C-alpha cells in the first residue's frame, strides 16, 4: 500500500511539474510574441491645424506699442501609437512598460505675417511699417512614434 501511495504521489508531482513547464512555456511564448512593437495600426501623422496667434510688441520703456493677430495654418502631430504592459521577472514592479507617443521627428522654422495690427487704444494701424508683423515659429515637418520620455535630436 505504501508503494502504491508513493507511486501515485510521484506521478502527481511529475504531472504538476509538466503542467508548470507547459504553462511557463506558453507564457514565455505569449510574452515573446507580444513584446515586438507592432507598427501596423499606428496612425501618428503630420496634420494641418488652424490656430489664432496674438503677439504683443513693447517699446524700449516696456510700454505696449502694438498688438497683432491672425489665423495661420501650421502642422501638428496627431495619432495613436501602440503601448503595452507585460509581466516581467526582471523589473521590480513585476511589469515591463513600453509606452510610445506621437511626436515630431523633425522641425522647421517658418516665417509668418500677422496682418491685423492695432495700437494700444485698439485702433487698426495702417502705415506700412506697423500694419503687419513678421514672426517666426517652429512646426513639425514629420511625426512618428517615439518611446515616451525619449529626447528628439
From Swiss-Prot:
Which biological processes are named by the entry's GO terms?
A: G protein-coupled receptor signaling pathway
Q: Which UniProt keywords apply?
A: Disulfide bond, Hormone, Secreted, Signal
User: In the UniProt record, which is one GO cellular component term?
Assistant: extracellular region
Q: Where in the cell is it found?
A: Secreted
Extract the GO molecular function terms from the UniProt entry.
G protein-coupled receptor binding; neuropeptide hormone activity
Database matches in InterPro entries: Bursicon_suB (IPR034441), Cystine-knot_cytokine (IPR029034)
**Which ranges does the record mark as transmembrane?**
none
Give disulfide pairs as residue numbers. Answer: 44-102, 68-117, 77-143, 81-145, 99-148
- Residue span, CTCK domain: 44-139
Top-rank taxon of the source lineage equals Eukaryota
Subunit text: Heterodimer of burs and pburs.
The function of this protein is:
Final heterodimeric neurohormone released at the end of the molting cycle, involved in the sclerotization (tanning) of the insect cuticle, melanization and wing spreading.
User: PANTHER family recorded for this chain?
Assistant: PARTNER OF BURSICON
The protein depicted here goes by the name Partner of bursicon
Give the source species: Anopheles gambiae (African malaria mosquito)
Q: Give the taxonomic lineage as stored in the record.
A: Eukaryota, Metazoa, Ecdysozoa, Arthropoda, Hexapoda
